[in-house]
Amino acid sequence: MAGNFDSEDRASWYWGKQNRQEAVNLLQGQRHGVFLVRDSTTIPGDYVLSVSENSKVSHYIINSVTNNRQSSTAGMVQSRFRIGDQEFDSLPTLLEFYKIHYLDTTTLIEPVSKSKQSGVIQRQEEVEYLRALFDFIGNDDEDLPFKKGDILRIREKPEEQWWNAEDSDGRRGMIPVPYVEKYRPPSSPGSALIGGNQENSHPQPLGGPEPGPYAQPSVNTPLPNLQNGPIFARVIQKRVPNAYDKTALALEVGDLVKVTKINVSGQWEGECNGKYGHFPFTHVRLLEQNPEEDFS
C-alpha cells in the first residue's frame, strides 16, 4: 500500500535545520516508513530524508543539482533534486515516487507527527524503557503480551498501574506496571534497543556535523501489487514470535513465504511451511513474480 500523506503539504514533513541525532530522537521507535525531511548541516542547499526502517533510522542525502534558489521568472534555472541515481523536479515529486518505491526496506508511509511532538525535539534521554520482570500473557485485546527479560518502550502513562508500551517488533498495547522495572540502555543516548539508529550515532550539538555515511536507496524497487498475482519472498532474518501470539509466523532464514496481504503498518500476512500468519516485511526479501514452481 502506498503512503497516505500530502506531499505538497511541506509543513507536514519539512523540519528545517536539524542534525542527525535530533532526527533519530524523533524517529526511533516509530513504525516503518515514518519520515521527515531536514536541511543538510554540512552542505547548504541540500536536504536529508530521515526514515524509520528495519529497526533503525536511515538517512538519505538529497543533493540539489544546482544551488540556485532564485525564481525561474527571472530567467534562472530551477534546482533539481537527486537521491541515489534518481533525479526529480521537486521535493514533493521525490516523496511521491518513494510512496510506491522502496528506499531500502520500506516505502514512505507518513511524516512524523509534529502535533504529537508539540514542536519540541524529543531528546533520547527522555525516552523511557522498561524490562519485564515476569511473563505477561495478556487478558484483553488491548494488552501487550511479553516475556520475562523483554525490553519495552513507554508510549503513554494513562493509568497508575497500566501503561501503554511498544515491544521490539513494533507491537503496542497496555502493560501492568508491577510486571516491569525501569531500564536504562547500556549505550550512549545516540543508540536505543527499540528502533535505534544503527549507524554512527554519537550525540552531536545542535546544528553539528553529520556523522557517519548516508544510506543509499534501492534502484527502482516498487511496492508489490497483489492484483498482479501471487507474490513470494525469501526469509533473510530469523524470527521467533512471541509464544502467546498464535497469529505470528515463525521464520527461518531461507524459507519461502507466499505473501497474501500487504498492510501499510509493515506487518504483512502470508503462508510459510503450511502455516498462515503475520510477519514483519523487513524479515524477507521479495523474489521475482510467480516463482510458484519453487513454492512448497
UniProtKB/Swiss-Prot annotation:
Entries under Gene3D superfamilies matching the protein: SH2 domain (3.30.505.10), SH3 Domains (2.30.30.40)
Record organism: Xenopus laevis (African clawed frog)
Domain annotation SH3: ranges: 125-185, 228-289
A GO CC term assigned to this protein in UniProt: plasma membrane
Name of the protein described by the UniProt record: Adapter molecule crk
Gene: crk
Annotated compartments: Cytoplasm; Cell membrane
Modification sites for Phosphotyrosine: Y214
Family, similarity comment: Belongs to the CRK family.
Keyword vocabulary terms for this entry: Cell membrane, Cytoplasm, Membrane, Phosphoprotein, Repeat, SH2 domain, SH3 domain
GO BP annotations, alphabetical order: cell migration; enzyme-linked receptor protein signaling pathway; ephrin receptor signaling pathway; regulation of actin cytoskeleton organization; regulation of cell motility; regulation of GTPase activity; regulation of intracellular signal transduction
